[in-house]
């Protein structure tokens, strides 16, 4: 039988708690983003869709997520400095189509850039919700309504 020291037990419990919080953040942000803004379609052949059920109190997750992840807050479009008064959280991306991880993050826009972004209707068969423009994928906007209809009929 394996015995844990108090320190090992504390570290294990902290790791488990952090993992639960991370999963809740990921699912809560995804649910919020799908319901309120534009999702991006990318070439993803896995067809795997994340489970977004069972999340009710994502304000707590949003607060936790922003405090830990947004140290340098600038608009993803124009690059202006953001604060709580002009910040709009717009997209998250679930990494992991290739390596199996499920890290979530969100792109921030100022009010004016967020209002000027225009979604286009595209095929939502293969998708991953995305945030930052990165070099490995070409981002094609998808309307939220089309994606919600695809997910929930």
Put a short name on every predicted segment:
Residues 67-73, 103-106:
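Short metal-coordination and nucleic-acid-contact micro-motifs, chiefly zinc-binding Cys/His arrays
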Residues 75-78, 110-113:
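Short cysteine-rich clusters marking metal-coordination/redox-active sites
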Residues 72, 83, 114:
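Core catalytic machinery and nucleic-acid-binding channels of phosphodiester-processing enzymes
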């Amino acid at each position: 039988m394996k015995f844990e020291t108090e320190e090992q037990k504390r570290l294990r419990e902290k790791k488990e708690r952090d993992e639960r919080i991370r999963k809740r953040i990921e699912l809560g942000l995804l649910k919020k983003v799908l319901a309120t803004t534009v999702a991006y379609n990318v070439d993803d052949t896995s067809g795997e869709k994340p489970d977004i059920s069972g999340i009710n109190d994502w304000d707590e997750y949003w607060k936790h997520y922003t405090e830990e992840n947004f140290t340098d807050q600038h608009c993803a479009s124009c690059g202006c400095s953001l604060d709580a008064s002009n910040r709009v959280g717009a997209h998250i991306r679930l990494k992991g189509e290739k390596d199996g991880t499920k890290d979530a993050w969100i792109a921030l826009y100022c009010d004016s850039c967020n209002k000027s972004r225009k979604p286009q209707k595209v095929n939502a068969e293969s998708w991953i919700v995305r945030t930052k423009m990165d070099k490995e994928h070409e981002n094609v906007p998808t309307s939220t309504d089309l994606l919600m209809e695809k997910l929930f009929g």
